[in-house]
Amino acid sequence: METFLFTSESVNEGHPDKLCDQISDAVLDACLEQDPDSKVACETCTKTNMVMVFGEITTKATVDYEKIVRDTCRSIGFISDDVGLDADKCKVLVNIEQQSPDIAQGVHGHFTKRPEDIGAGDQGHMFGYATDETPELMPLSHVLATKIGAKLTEVRKNGTCRWLRPDGKTQVTVEYYNDNGAMVPVRVHTVLISTQHDETVTNDEIARDLKEHVIKPIIPEKYLDDKTIFHLNPSGRFVIGGPHGDAGLTGRKIIIDTYGGWGAHGGGAFSGKDPTKVDRSGAYIVRQAAKSVVANGMARRALVQVSYAIGVPEPLSVFVDTYGTGLIPDKEILKIVKESFDFRPGMMTINLDLKRGGNGRFLKTAAYGHFGRDDPDFTWEVVKPLKWDKPQA
């Protein structure tokens, strides 16, 4: 059996870039909660002892940006300079302006257009991907890297590993077999964890705790063997982390947010953007489309692309590729996808209920992936029943 190796990485919520994603989405949540028609393009950057939020926001909501920044940093665990940032003492800079009137008239006609006539907020192309290799219909390499990152945070916050600090990165290499276009995981080849820690813990303690409390509960035993390689804090020391260690910026972890390098990516980030921004809503609808194709048994693996022009409601193109795993031709699957999903931005917003903020709805997406999550707020993960005629054997 000929196999190959594929690697996906993740970072957890204390990584500086992910901190910025979460702040941007916390701002979006606050705006949408009070004013569902808010137009939000919120960026965040951070470095030692400083967080800045900036961008274009048009909203009727009353938003305390500084409080959102401090609350988000605190909830992640940035509560002192020792761990990389002090939520209560750091400088918070805010530079927010209104959405450009040129964009506003072209996209939503200054709020006068009907939902079906609302244009895309920008040009761009987005991809959705699904694969039958996991129950989530997501790539195993990505799922494991993401879940290990989430577990790191869990054992830090619940006190299991008191030496842990907020910043951390994970990476998983999986050995795969290509079954006529479908991906079949064989084993986990390598697990890499680099996590921030306090000064008191030894490297041996770190390795022992990570294996016992993080790796063992997450990676199914069937994928591990005596040849699996573990790189646990291979640099030897990771005390300085968070924004003190590295600068952070919204939108720099777009592969971690999506499919871990599988499928494809149009380049647009998600966090801090309201649903008229097709970078986000377009990527959500094509995930639902790809997932529905696989879940309905039409293919074992699917990639769906959609593209837009600014101010134009109808997509410019829709594309489907099932990597040779489709039970019917891709052109027939494409026809079913176009009949079953409304790719107009205003209609995607309604059908996926994307104007609903609050409850940390978009904040939840900003760490540990936007796809493959079992949470009713992730409306794009709901499989749509598709009508198709299965070919007779």
From Swiss-Prot:
Subcellular location as annotated? Cytoplasm
Kindly provide the name given to this protein in its UniProt entry: S-adenosylmethionine synthase 5
| Presence of keyword ATP-binding | yes
| Co-factor binding comment | Binds 2 divalent ions per subunit. The metal ions interact primarily with the substrate. Can utilize magnesium, manganese or cobalt (in vitro).
Q: Which gene specifies this protein's sequence?
A: MSAMS5
Residues annotated as binding Mg(2+) are E9
What job does this protein perform? Answer: Catalyzes the formation of S-adenosylmethionine from methionine and ATP. The reaction comprises two steps that are both catalyzed by the same enzyme: formation of S-adenosylmethionine (AdoMet) and triphosphate, and subsequent hydrolysis of the triphosphate.
Reaction(s) the record says it catalyses = L-methionine + ATP + H2O = S-adenosyl-L-methionine + phosphate + diphosphate
